[in-house]
Amino acid sequence: MKILHLSDDGLPDWRVEKSALTAKKSGHEVFFGGRLNNNAKSTIFSEIHRINWTAGAMVGIPYYYHRVKRQIEKLVKQLVPDIIHSHNIGSAKISQDLGLPAVFDDHEYFGMLSRVNAENINLQDTRNLKSGFDRIKQNMKVSFISRQSISNWTNWEKELILSVPTITVSEQIANELREVADGKTKEIIVVPNFPLETEISFKEPQAHGHLSSVYAGGDSKYKQVTNRDISGLTNLFADNDIGNLTIIGWENAESSEKYKATGFLTRDKMFSEMIQNSIGLIPWKKHWSHPFLNPNKAYEYAHAGLFVMLTSDLRSVASTLEDNCLTFEDYDDLASKLEYFRSNTDELYGRRLKIFNFARKNLFWEKHEQKIMDAYKLI
């Protein structure tokens, strides 16, 4: 069987590649269509093909949308896939328009994402535009794209979950989608974004002589992201006796005595850096979208033997980790709890061992991957 994975993003994309690897292990041939850059490569896909997505196409502006639709139609005629695995809402909608056998991978919960994107667009800085007229034009443009995204993505998502098998990353999202569709969804399958078992065969974590925390994420440095806001985090460590902080993904120009940044790391180097720490943080300031987010960094932390601390409204993560994590309300609360662990290192080490063993038994991709093959059978 031929399976074509479509995305409005490029490679590497570990969620897309894990899904493809699942099918490939079962003897199927997998292909990729999406944005390609100079670093686009994969040993998983038989072929990778360029699809020129634009912002207009992604939000359904007819001229741009139909240009991408023609590209996908041409690619489908060339490859003749048995199944389309759509990793973005635009390609899922186009697959539906073309009458193709498709699965919709709604791992972003696109109706929610459209509203978050609208918030972020409204925060864009237009101070560098040359004139007031330029600012007006820019504001009109982003306002139009924002409205299109919210309207189309919300409507498309409802159409898709009523008509095609849908994969998502948490029970919270699945339940919300069922409620949106009044319980009339086709089939909604939960496949959490856990690491592959083959990449997490780590030894039992070792005790550390000092307290150190890590945050993995290149987001939120050069632009405001309303639901991943970590502003003030580095100052929190600089101003308090709560150990050191490493941020994986940020460039290291601002490193100091209590804080360092690693820049981008490959996955193996990322895990090697994580292991040097004791606590994995998800320190996003509270946001209405958080109950529906299920970031995979929490589970990477767990496999690296890090005790996970996260904002209390990230309920999907807290539910998955059960009692193997600790939530906080704000940065003052986070600082207080880090101070406690600085003075109670034996307790912290015990918690690290506990979450490490919990992860080895429960938090790996292969435990759920058969659900993807089951979704294909529903088409």
Where do the language-model regions lie?
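N-terminal subdomain of nucleotide-sugar transferases
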Residues: 1-40, 231-241
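Nucleotide-sugar-dependent
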Residues: 14, 221-227, 268, 272-273, ...
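Conserved catalytic-core segment of nucleotide-activated headgroup transferases in glycan assembly
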Residues: 16-17, 21, 194-257, 263-271
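A short, charged, and often flexible helix/loop element on the N-terminal side
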Residues: 46-73, 136-145, 261
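Membrane-proximal helix-turn-helix segments that form the acceptor-binding/catalytic region
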Residues: 70-74, 93, 104, 110-112, ...
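Donor nucleotide-sugar binding/catalytic pocket of nucleotide-sugar-dependent glycosyltransferases
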Residues: 138-201
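A charged, aromatic-enriched C-terminal amphipathic alpha-helix characteristic of glycosyltransferases
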Residues: 329, 343-377
